[in-house]
Curated annotation (Swiss-Prot):
SUPFAM superfamilies given in the database record: SurE-like
Major site of localization recorded for this protein: cytoplasm
Organism of this sequence: Campylobacter jejuni subsp. jejuni serotype O:23/36 (strain 81-176)
Name of the molecule in the record: 5'-nucleotidase SurE
Alphabetical list of InterPro entries matching this protein: SurE (IPR030048), SurE-like_Pase/nucleotidase (IPR002828), SurE-like_sf (IPR036523)
Keyword Nucleotide-binding set for record: yes
Main EC class the enzyme belongs to: hydrolase
Required cofactor names: a divalent metal cation
Protein family membership: Belongs to the SurE nucleotidase family.
Catalytic activity field: a ribonucleoside 5'-phosphate + H2O = a ribonucleoside + phosphate
Length: 258
């Protein structure tokens, strides 16, 4: 029997997580463990908690919320505390409410859950559902169907990537999708703002905000294809070295020494 560990960054009560658990329980004869944050941890990236203790709070059969933990905390502690004899065959992070594309991947708690898994040597996928602000209720039907297909492929054929690599998967908002595309991550155009105010005691405070976010116009990027109605799969590697720039930096350093 296969073993699956699930986490997310929207919190243990999120709709995307509930839909995913229901589908996996119905479609796969697998031992499923869920460890999710006790509250929403969107955009927490790959942060882990080192300054205070964490605790599992059981909310169901093999279902735990991690008291004030991040997605990376959830995966790390689950692998080290809940799995004594055998590690999971697959870690799934999601389904996130909102896309995780382009450089947003670096901010994403959803993607960080998958990153932590592959750092620990476990194959992982990150799942995110794109939606429009006008949508009152998200439709996860396509996301669940595609996720089922991908997981079945992993179990039947093995994980398609090398160590320390994961699949970042995004699902379009459209009810009828055009297909699945393997593509690169796009390039975000950021425009961050910070709104200041003063509390009743005269102390200034700030709210961080991301206003008018956009992407560079790239034909075959994840965000471009997602907007056209395709589900996107982007292989992500944790090797951050810019190999093509090494010679340039070496030459630059040598020039500075002369």
């Amino acid at each position: 029997m296969k073993e699956i560990l699930i986490t997310n960054d929207d919190g243990y009560e999120s709709e995307g997580l509930k839909k995913l658990i229901k589908m996996l329980t119905k479609e796969f004869k697998a031992k499923i463990t869920i460890v999710a944050p006790a509250s929403e941890k969107s955009a927490c990236s790959h942060s882990i908690t080192l300054t205070k203790p964490l605790r599992f709070v059981k909310v169901g059969k093999r279902f735990y919320k991690l008291d004030d933990g991040t997605p990376a905390d959830c995966v790390y502690l689950a692998l080290h505390a809940l799995y004594k004899k055998r590690l999971p065959d697959l870690v799934i992070s999601g389904i996130n409410k909102g896309a995780n594309v382009g450089e947003d991947i670096t901010y994403s708690g959803t993607c960080a859950g998958a990153m932590e898994a592959v750092l620990q040597g476990i194959p992982a996928i990150a799942l995110s559902q794109f939606y429009k602000k006008s949508e009152k209720e998200l439709d996860y039907k396509n996301a669940l169907q595609i996720t089922k297909k991908i997981i079945q492929n992993i179990f039947d054929k093995g994980f398609p990537l090398e160590k320390k690599e994961f699949l970042n998967i995004n699902f379009p908002a459209k009810s009828k999708i055009k297909g699945i595309k393997i593509c690169k991550a796009g390039k975000r155009v950021y425009n961050f703002e910070a709104y200041s105010n003063v509390n009743p005691r005269g102390v200034e405070y700030y709210w961080l905000a991301a206003a008018n976010l956009d992407f560079e116009d790239e034909k075959n990027s994840d965000i471009a294809l997602l907007k056209k109605g395709y589900a996107t799969i982007t292989p992500i590697m944790l090797d951050l070295t810019a190999y093509e720039r090494m010679k340039k930096v070496k030459k630059w350093l040598k020039a500075n020494d002369e």
